């Protein structure tokens, strides 16, 4: 079994391409996962689809085939050229894949280092796949380690103190542009999901009143009530009124198409500071003289200061990620040797049984001596196998001994391809991440 991640993130993929590759709804995500895991060489998979990344996380039988299967499905989904997609994609295999997912969950690979949302987003991505039958024990143990790693990063560094998100960067930029004048202004937030709620909270902190807009008034009203009396709820039907009256707008819906289009603009002379925090984009490209429009990728330069401030802590955090990656693979390799040892002992038991039956049938061993002879044979073989099994366990964590272990499997005709490794987990790791 192998691990692989195919990544299209803010580091290697422009926003316009990420928009085409994004999964705006659960139905599209479920269909893609069903198609991908339908290939015999893909054991399990889940999708991380956020404003900053689209990544396919897999446990595979063949990384080469899995990689090209992902590219093929993604090119069909996004209407993109296969080879263009291949030249853009970042591929992580095995230990690189494990280190990458640990970094992602620990918020070290984010556009804003230390942002607080990604851990929950990855957990939810796995939970979705688990519930749809496309992810299970193989990726569960990866996520279990990733969550533990993220917890240690948070506890051992201050990288996540005063949690930062794209929403906070956007509000900070608005504050920078408007200065103290922002106090008392009305900020329009389109979308009542996690990002919209974060934007509303940050606007309240800088002294703004907030209008929270969504499609379902009851849901939006519930969210608005939880944020306090300075937040008003309204529906998308009244969006035109707000964008032509107030200058500050933050949009983060899950709509597959822009919700703010040029035909909604009535007052072209109104100064506007708009922040599009959605993938795909919520705000259509438009030419307005007094419009300052910031999209996801525009916030990258703004967040560079945040990277610089946290660089020292990020070094410490990356050391933790490297250690957890080594520990995970050491555990995985140690785990993989147990079925080999068990089958060696099963072969011995079968040989003892076969020879005992032959000896009894031929009269070499009287029936009354059978129990003692069987016990003696078992003790002899246990003593004979003791040193080899101990050495196998010790060498299982060393990559240079992989060929040795494979040779043992070949010598004893041992097949571990279809073994359920779950029964061999040591006690420290049995709980894992609960889907």
Curated annotation (Swiss-Prot):
Query: Any other comment in the entry?
Result: During catalysis, the active site Cys acts as a nucleophile attacking the alpha-carbonyl group of tRNA-bound glutamate with the formation of a thioester intermediate between enzyme and glutamate, and the concomitant release of tRNA(Glu). The thioester intermediate is finally reduced by direct hydride transfer from NADPH, to form the product GSA.
Q: Where does NADP(+) bind?
A: 191-196
Residues of the site described as Important for activity: 100
Q: Where does substrate bind?
A: 50-53, 110, 115-117, 121
For this protein, the record's PANTHER family field holds: GLUTAMYL-TRNA REDUCTASE 1, CHLOROPLASTIC (PTHR43120:SF1)
Give the quaternary structure. Homodimer.
Q: Which GO terms describe its molecular function?
A: glutamyl-tRNA reductase activity; NADP binding
Q: What lineage is this protein's organism placed in? A: Bacteria, Pseudomonadati, Campylobacterota, Epsilonproteobacteria, Campylobacterales
Q: What's this chain's function?
A: Catalyzes the NADPH-dependent reduction of glutamyl-tRNA(Glu) to glutamate 1-semialdehyde (GSA).
* Keywords from the named record: NADP, Oxidoreductase, Porphyrin biosynthesis
* Originating species: Sulfurovum sp. (strain NBC37-1)
In Swiss-Prot or TrEMBL terms, this protein is called Glutamyl-tRNA reductase
- GO biological process terms on file: protoporphyrinogen IX biosynthetic process
Record text about domains: Possesses an unusual extended V-shaped dimeric structure with each monomer consisting of three distinct domains arranged along a curved 'spinal' alpha-helix. The N-terminal catalytic domain specifically recognizes the glutamate moiety of the substrate. The second domain is the NADPH-binding domain, and the third C-terminal domain is responsible for dimerization.
Concerning its family, UniProt says: Belongs to the glutamyl-tRNA reductase family.
Reaction(s) catalysed by this chain's protein: (S)-4-amino-5-oxopentanoate + tRNA(Glu) + NADP(+) = L-glutamyl-tRNA(Glu) + NADPH + H(+)
Broad class of enzyme this protein falls into:
oxidoreductase
The record, for CDD domains, names: NAD_bind_Glutamyl_tRNA_reduct
> So where's the catalytic machinery, residue-wise?
51
Q: Which pathway is this protein assigned to?
A: Porphyrin-containing compound metabolism; protoporphyrin-IX biosynthesis; 5-aminolevulinate from L-glutamyl-tRNA(Glu): step 1/2
Cross-referenced InterPro entries: 4pyrrol_synth_GluRdtase, 4pyrrol_synth_GluRdtase_dimer, 4pyrrol_synth_GluRdtase_N, GluRdtase_CS, GluRdtase_dimer_dom_sf, GluRdtase_N_sf, NAD(P)-bd_dom_sf, Shikm_DH/Glu-tRNA_Rdtase
Q: What is its EC number?
A: 1.2.1.70
């Amino acid at each position: 079994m192998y691990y692989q991640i195919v990544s299209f993130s803010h580091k290697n993929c422009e926003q316009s391409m990420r928009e085409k590759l994004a999964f705006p709804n659960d139905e599209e995500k479920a269909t893609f996962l069903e198609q991908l895991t339908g290939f015999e060489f893909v054991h399990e998979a889940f999708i991380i689809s956020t404003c900053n990344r689209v990544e396919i996380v897999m446990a595979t039988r063949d990384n080469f085939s899995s990689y090209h299967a992902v590219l093929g499905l993604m090119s069909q989904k996004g209407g993109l050229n296969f080879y263009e997609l291949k030249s853009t994609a970042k591929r992580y295999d095995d230990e690189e894949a494990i280190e990458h997912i640990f970094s992602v969950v620990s918020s070290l690979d984010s556009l804003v280092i230390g942002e607080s949302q990604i851990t929950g987003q990855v957990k939810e991505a796995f939970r979705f796949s688990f519930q749809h039958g496309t992810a299970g024990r193989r990726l569960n143990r990866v996520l279990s380690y990733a969550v533990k790693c993220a917890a240690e990063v948070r506890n051992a560094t201050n990288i996540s103190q005063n949690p930062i998100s794209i929403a906070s960067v956007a509000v900070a930029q608005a504050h920078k542009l408007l200065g103290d004048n922002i106090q008392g202004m009305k900020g329009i937030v389109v979308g009542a999901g996690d990002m919209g709620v974060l934007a509303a909270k940050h606007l309240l902190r800088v002294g703004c009143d907030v209008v929270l807009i969504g499609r379902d008034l009851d849901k939006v009203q519930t969210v608005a009530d939880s944020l306090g009396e300075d937040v008003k709820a309204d529906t998308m039907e009244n969006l035109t009124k707000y964008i032509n009256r107030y200058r500050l707008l933050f949009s983060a819906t899950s709509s597959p198409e822009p919700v703010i289009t040029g035909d909604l603009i009535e007052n072209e002379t109104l100064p506007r500071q708009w922040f599009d925090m959605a993938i795909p984009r919520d705000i259509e490209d438009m030419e307005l003289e007094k419009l300052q429009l910031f999209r996801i990728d525009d916030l990258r330069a703004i967040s560079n200061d945040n990277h610089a401030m946290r660089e020292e802590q990020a070094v410490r955090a990356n050391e933790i990620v490297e250690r957890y990656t080594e520990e995970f693979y050491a555990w995985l390799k140690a785990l993989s040797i147990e079925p080999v040892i068990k089958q060696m002992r099963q072969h011995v038991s079968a040989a003892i049984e076969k020879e005992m039956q032959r000896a009894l049938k031929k009269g070499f061993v009287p029936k009354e001596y059978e129990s003692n002879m069987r016990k003696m044979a078992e003790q002899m073989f246990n003593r004979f196998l003791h040193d080899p099994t101990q050495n196998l366990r010790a060498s299982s964590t060393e990559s240079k001994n992989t060929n040795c272990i494979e040779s043992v499997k070949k010598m004893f005709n041992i097949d571990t391809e279809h073994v359920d490794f779950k029964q061999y987990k040591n006690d420290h790791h049995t709980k894992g991440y609960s889907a």
